[in-house]
Amino acid sequence: MGSFLSFFLISSRTLALVLISVTGETLESNFLHHKKEKLTHFRVYWHDIVTGQDSSSVSIMNPPKKYTGATGFGLMRMIDNPLTLTPKLSSKMVGRAQGFYAGTSKEEIGLLMAMNFAILDGKYNGSTITVLGRNSVFDKVREMPVIGGSGLFRFARGYVQASTHEFNLKTGNAIVEYNCYLLHY
C-alpha cells in the first residue's frame, strides 16, 4: 500500500509539472506570436533625497565598523524616489523609483541597484520596469539591465543608462538622469 501511494504521488507531481510546462509554453507562444515587439525610449530624472523631513531614501543598514571607509561597503538604503521629466524636483513627476541600493564593493564605490520604476502618468500609467544591476557611481555613464516589467511593459527587457546630473557632497542628495531603452510587446 505504501509503495503504491508513493508511486501515485510521484506520478501525479511529474504529470502536473509536464502539464504546467507545456501549457505555459503554449500560452506564452500564442501571446508572443500575436503581438509585435517594439522599442521604447524615455528619459526620467531620479531624485535621491537623503536629507530633510521629506527624504525619499532611508538607511536600513549601516556598514559594519570594520568597513567604515569611503566606499560604503555594507550600506543599504531603501528608496521611494521621485522620477521627474526634468532635473528640477518641482517639474512634473511621472513616476517613482522604489526598491533599494547597497554598497557592494570594498575597493570603490559600487552599488547593487534593485528597483522598480513605477510609471504614474501618461500612456504608461500603471506600468513598471525592473532594474537590477551594478552601478559604478563614478563612471560618467553606467549601464544596468532591465530584467522585466508589467502593464504595457510586460515581457520587457533592455537597459538603462544612468548619468549623474548633480551630487551634493554635503547632503548626499543626488539627481541622476536615466535613459531607458526597452523592448516589449
From Swiss-Prot:
GO cellular component, one term: apoplast
InterPro entries hit by this protein: Allene_oxi_cyc_Dirigent, Dirigent
Principal location listed in the UniProt entry: secreted
One annotated GO biological process: phenylpropanoid biosynthetic process
Localisation per UniProt entry: Secreted, Extracellular space, Apoplast
Keyword Signal: yes
Residues listed as glycosylation sites in the UniProt record: 125
Signal peptide stretch: 1-16
Source organism, top-level taxon: Eukaryota
Alphabetic keyword roster: Apoplast, Glycoprotein, Secreted, Signal
Its biological purpose: Dirigent proteins impart stereoselectivity on the phenoxy radical-coupling reaction, yielding optically active lignans from two molecules of coniferyl alcohol in the biosynthesis of lignans, flavonolignans, and alkaloids and thus plays a central role in plant secondary metabolism.
Assembly and binders: Homodimer.
Family: Belongs to the plant dirigent protein family.
PANTHER family: NUCLEOPORIN-RELATED
Protein name: Dirigent protein 19
Organism of derivation: Arabidopsis thaliana
